[in-house]
């Protein structure tokens, strides 16, 4: 009887561990970035189509996400020196007033947009999620979780991928 109880507890624990990692590292493999409708801070609808032909980094973030805030701060610190010709595009599913407050409070030189859908509807279950897109419109790197922008080798790799 004791062995059966231990087995049941292990199976249940294994199931929840599996679900945690499955959701944490799951990103939509055929994500249509350029067709995704977005709203700017003024409430105007737009899409990433207007960035076609440019190099850009997209980060899906939330104002309450600690890892997202750390990553945005690090990106801000290296943007002008390491990525002067790369647009940084930040997409949130926060309400419009939170987006506006966040932009005013942080004053980052990034482009901020609000998704028309909640992240789970986009199959984004863990944030931040980052995409590096070259000037040909190809996603050259995607990463679930914060990128360590203080790691010089990673920044160099990102710069090379964006070329």
Give the location of each predicted region.
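Positively charged n-region of N-terminal signal peptides that target proteins for export
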Residues: 1-4
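Hydrophobic membrane-insertion alpha-helices, especially the h-region
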Residues: 6-20
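N-terminal "domain-start" segment that seeds a small globular fold
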Residues: 17-48
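Short active-site neighborhood of thiol/selenol oxidoreductases, capturing the structured segment around
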Residues: 47-66
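Hydrophobic beta-strand anchors of alpha/beta hydrolase catalytic cores
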Residues: 57-58, 88, 130
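C-type cytochrome heme c attachment motif
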Residues: 63-70, 129
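Structural microenvironment flanking redox-active thiols in thiol-disulfide oxidoreductases
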Residues: 69-106, 117-120
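Thiol/disulfide oxidoreductase modules built on the thioredoxin-like
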Residues: 104-108, 114-160
